[in-house]
């Protein structure tokens, strides 16, 4: 359960609780809010107790390790020996975790972020406008004095990055020296700089801070003027000076003084600036591209009132310290939604997510967005993530926002960037998969991003310049290997829970910084708890569906347990929510019944026709003519009675849940499939339509099938799934075709031509499903896409990968 501890009287913002398991004990430290003053969320440390049955818990590596010809060994005894499901519901624990996250999402304003010692030092350097010789913001100096680390440095206390510690520490030493205070702290800080400056040589270049090659030499020059002696013969420093000189020669001074660019973010390191021109490029909040240090530098030179207001507001808001960038409202709103979705817990927060995306859409522009609202500079990372989420949620957004980022055959994050960001191109790739027909710019974006990411993966160069995260190679690898058309929600969640670093993930700006509403252990532990809770139910269902399988002797009709497991896995990976159990089981049983009928009669057209005729007779008479049972072959009779018994159970389940009798609709749907199948013996013809119709009926969704849009959705879904089914059948014994390195397919191969048609139809289907202006219930439309993606997954996912996903999703608990 969640248990509140006594409130802290500490002046800093209260910690937001994280979760911890007591069996076994794993400490999860609380989530700190880094000295912010306005306190909207007040939750103390909490923990969760998971109570399991007395039987010792076991993990289930055998499902991923014990393979026979690429398939898991399915043995009844193995299944029964697995860890038993939880004895008690964790509903209350989950509810309390959800309440915490709801409070977080409901308190969003300009973004929660950590304090930057470097930026705070620049603010502390500002001289009082009315009292020369004294600091304008003494509370910033006090923050510096209060936050020196035990080793004498300033910076992120939990991650040692030499670039971060050195630039933070040198800036703070300069600020203290400037005002001749705390000489002991200055001495300790200077000793740290001298002892650690050589470590710059050993760090990954990808993790060099933004603008470090400009800002750090500038600080060294300031230190020298203040009489602070720092050895400048280090090879690392010489390399930094070389990079600075090269970058300064590339800066288009005429452009930067007349057009907003990312250079506004790092003015404090640039010489010979024309402030009369630059002040015209201020953001509406008075900042220079939302950078406190850049704005403080401008304030020193201009005494501009808008600059002063921006800095003054931050100093008061954060109790003397300031972040490295602020606001970060769009960044926070977008990335929170992405994390919640990938962690599989977004269903708890529909109103909050709607509000988040509505906020983002209000500040969306024809050129995209950046991390903060009302910016005249945009970046591809925030634009791509925003585009993807807005389109997924039915907003009309044009892909033309990406045109400004296209430079020749490449796409860049910013104008004038020196190197690409892995995550920026990764998010561009994710956005490009939301493609509608005729969106050429997204085709080009997908082609470029696929090539770029594959090259980086092949070279083991998946380090990013914007974030240090737990498993970026895993995230990128999954996205490349399992494209969005084949991405099943529960598979993505199961893997992302392991990839998400929680509060250990740290972002790279001018300094390292934290985004506690984006990266925290609260989301992570709630996701783990919810996943295991759902999985426990799925394991119970798996046991029950095996009993249903055995009870009807479906093995005798050509359906083996491997097929049963895969079918249930597909249903569960798409419809995983506990409250949607009837839809999930209906999906699995419908597919198994279709397979049994098609498998048993696949070699005889006459028997198919006989089955179809008897099926219709049974349908019309409910099994009786003049009070006597139909006289048919035992197998046909058994299958027909099996189908109708199962359909009647479906109807009863729907009646109990939704209070609506769907028997007639179910019978009609099955009759349509049977008649279609008996003509050519192809079970795939119309199977998707049967599945979509059945799932929607079980979900309580009814809609007129006469409408043109409904008919178009069925036609597209049937066409694509039929092609995918055949593709899978033809290629099930060989490696599925992979996307070529150029993001397309080899058109000389007949199978590739069919694949291109599938891709074209998928784009149209995605457009129909995501279009919110047609008036159709989005839940109804989503079923069409969900079913189609399951067919896509089956067709293009290697059997070994499927086995791995089955083991992870159904049988391996999250720890």
From Swiss-Prot:
One of its GO terms (molecular function) is terpene synthase activity. Mg(2+) binds at residues 379, 381. One of its GO terms (biological process) is gibberellin biosynthetic process. Pfam families: Terpene_synth (PF01397), Terpene_synth_C (PF03936). Substrate binds at residues 247, 465. Keywords: Chloroplast, Isomerase, Magnesium, Metal-binding, Plastid, Transit peptide. Inhibited by high concentrations of magnesium. A motif (DXDD motif) lies at residues 379-382. The Asp-Xaa-Asp-Asp (DXDD) motif is important for the catalytic activity through binding to Mg(2+). Diterpene synthase that catalyzes the formation of (-)-kolavenyl diphosphate from geranylgeranyl diphosphate (GGPP). This is (-)-kolavenyl diphosphate synthase TPS28, chloroplastic. It comes from Tripterygium wilfordii. The gene is TPS28.
